């Protein structure tokens, strides 16, 4: 299993809306994530800095990257662009984090 972590941003006035949209996520999005080998996906909100910290375990980089090309992911990104900064393809602006410590 590959552990990943990344940081995204949320608009300052959209904390509650971001949480509402994720509680729960669309069932079809959950199904796509699971079918592409995603496990233990969690997102944490730093309200003071408007940051989202995400962790996930994936089975392979290829399967994880393939999620982006699915119809449901494309629709989700479009749904979220009013609550967080997005790239030109509507994907969330994000930065992958380097793991520096892990205690199994």
From Swiss-Prot:
Per the record, the major location class is cytoplasm
Q: What is its EC number?
A: 5.1.3.32
Name a Pfam family for this protein.
Answer: rhaM
The record's InterPro entries line, in alphabetical order, gives: Dimeric_a/b-barrel (IPR011008), L-rhamnose_mutarotase (IPR013448), Rham/fucose_mutarotase (IPR008000)
Question: Keyword Amino-acid biosynthesis on this protein?
Answer: no
Question: Family, per the entry?
Answer: Belongs to the rhamnose mutarotase family.
By its UniProt entry, which NCBIfam families does this protein fall under? YiiL_rotase
**Designated name of the protein:** L-rhamnose mutarotase
Q: Which organism is it from?
A: Escherichia coli O127:H6 (strain E2348/69 / EPEC)
């Amino acid at each position: 299993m590959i552990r990943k972590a990344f940081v995204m941003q949320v608009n300052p006035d959209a904390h509650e809306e971001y949480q509402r949209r994720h509680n729960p996520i669309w069932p079809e999005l959950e199904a796509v994530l699971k079918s592409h080998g995603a496990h233990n996906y969690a997102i944490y909100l730093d309200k003071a800095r408007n940051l989202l910290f995400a962790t996930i375990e994936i089975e392979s980089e290829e399967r994880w990257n393939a999620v982006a090309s699915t119809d449901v992911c494309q629709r989700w990104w479009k749904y979220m662009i009013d609550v967080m900064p997005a790239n030109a393809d509507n994907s969330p602006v994000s930065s992958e984090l380097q793991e520096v410590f892990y205690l199994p």
